[in-house]
């Protein structure tokens, strides 16, 4: 349970960094509002690359009975939340990259080294 809480907190911190640092709007709907993963309900889980950039590991999830989806075309790792849960902390993994389409992370033929991090590791990096 504590591990899930730590992963959720990490996801929120990284998503905030990604959303606030984005130069473009992440939402293509007609409302004109920016899509912010951390304010729309439940945070999406992320894995980090070598530079500490967090990328979602799934393009949709259940949030208190409602299905939430990452916007079309956003980058993702195809490992899913279960894959992230099986990863060992701070060990490098070869993760397949993709783009979100209809709530599914569709592989794009590329891969990247990714890591599962902890809240403590994130705080050290931010200090």
Curated annotation (Swiss-Prot):
The subcellular location is: Secreted
**InterPro entries per the UniProt record, alphabetical:** EVA_Class_A (IPR045797)
What is one Pfam family matched by this protein?
Answer: EVA_Class_A
User: From the UniProt record, which GO molecular function terms apply?
Assistant: C-C chemokine binding
Intrachain S-S bonds: 42-63, 59-100, 76-105, 95-114
Swiss-Prot/TrEMBL keywords: Disulfide bond, Glycoprotein, Secreted, Signal
Instruction: Write the signal peptide boundaries.
Output: 1-21
Give the record's glycosylation annotations as residue positions. Answer: 49, 94
* GO CC entries: extracellular region
Chief location category: secreted
Which superkingdom, per the lineage? Answer: Eukaryota
Q: Which Gene3D superfamilies match?
A: 2.30.130.100
- Task performed by this protein: Salivary chemokine-binding protein which binds to host chemokines CCL1, CCL2, CCL3 and CCL5.
Give the protein name, as stated in the record.
Answer: Evasin P467
Q: Which organism is it from?
A: Rhipicephalus pulchellus (Yellow backed tick)
């Amino acid at each position: 349970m504590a591990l899930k809480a730590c992963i959720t907190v990490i996801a929120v911190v990284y998503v905030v960094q990604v959303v606030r640092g984005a130069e473009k709007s992440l939402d293509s709907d007609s409302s004109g509002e920016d899509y912010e993963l951390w304010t729309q309900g439940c945070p999406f889980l992320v894995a980090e690359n070598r530079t500490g950039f967090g990328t979602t590991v799934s393009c949709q999830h259940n949030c208190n009975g409602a299905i939430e989806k990452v916007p079309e075309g956003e980058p993702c790792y195809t490992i899913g939340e279960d894959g992230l849960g099986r990863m060992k902390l701070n060990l490098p993994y070869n993760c397949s990259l993709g783009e979100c389409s209809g709530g599914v992370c569709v592989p794009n033929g590329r891969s990247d080294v990714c890591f599962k991090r902890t809240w403590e590791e994130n705080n050290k990096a931010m200090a």
